[in-house]
């Protein structure tokens, strides 16, 4: 019931120092002084590309510790997400604890629940999976679906911790972690059979063309720059 749902503990995102501390403790088995200053700086740069949740940081640490691969190779695995990396991560989780749900499983379950909430949310999920994951303008979604639907959609994305808001921006925008977006696109491509159903993308293209025309008519350099960054993707 609703009382039970509202009582569930929500684990927020970790700060970079928290991510670093967790990663180093796992990699060095508690002896964080085992890393040199240069190695620590390299870890920081690596962790900037890892979703800021304990599960993601833990899996990254255990995976690199067991397989002895480079940071670049691991990030490539995340970007080229497939069933093999999914199985490998699940095996690692089984070895280190009783929890076996990987990031892919968590995100796809969240996507399923979001799509079940409203008939238009499936279209909006696909829509935001096709652009640059950073600084997506709210107006871009408003040009595709009704504003009330978009507001509700954003609420659901935030509810499942799939997005972050850029409070410092002068325009209402939000961002998705790149690996989260990659997982979403992989899942939606398979679920919607996009390889064969190319017509599914036609409304997206039509909406994008309209938004482009409207944007170019507005005297906002920032808005135009944002739009160009998404077109380049």
Model-derived features: where do they sit?
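Aliphatic-rich helical/repeat scaffold segments used for oligomerization and domain docking
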Residues: 1-233
């Amino acid at each position: 019931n609703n009382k039970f749902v509202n009582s569930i503990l929500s684990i927020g995102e970790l700060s970079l120092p928290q991510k670093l501390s967790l990663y180093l403790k796992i990699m060095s088995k508690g002896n964080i002084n085992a890393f040199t200053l240069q190695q620590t700086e390299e870890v920081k740069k690596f962790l900037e590309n890892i979703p800021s949740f304990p599960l993601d940081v833990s899996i990254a640490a255990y995976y690199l510790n067991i397989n002895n691969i480079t940071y670049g190779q691991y990030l490539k695995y995340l970007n080229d997400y497939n069933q093999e990396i999914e199985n490998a991560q699940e095996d690692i989780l089984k070895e280190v604890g009783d929890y076996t749900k990987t990031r892919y499983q968590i995100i796809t379950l969240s996507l399923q629940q979001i799509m079940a909430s409203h008939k238009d949310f499936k279209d909006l999920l696909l829509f935001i999976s096709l652009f640059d994951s950073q600084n997506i303008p709210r107006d871009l979604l408003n040009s595709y679906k009704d504003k009330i639907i978009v507001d509700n959609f954003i609420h659901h994305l935030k509810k499942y911790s799939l997005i972050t808001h850029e409070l410092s921006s002068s325009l209402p925008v939000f961002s998705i972690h790149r690996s989260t977006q990659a997982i979403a696109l992989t899942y939606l491509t398979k679920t919607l059979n996009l390889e064969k159903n190319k017509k599914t993308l036609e409304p997206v293209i039509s909406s994008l063309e309209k938004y482009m025309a409207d944007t170019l008519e507005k005297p906002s350099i920032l808005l135009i720059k944002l739009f160009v960054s998404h077109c380049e993707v």
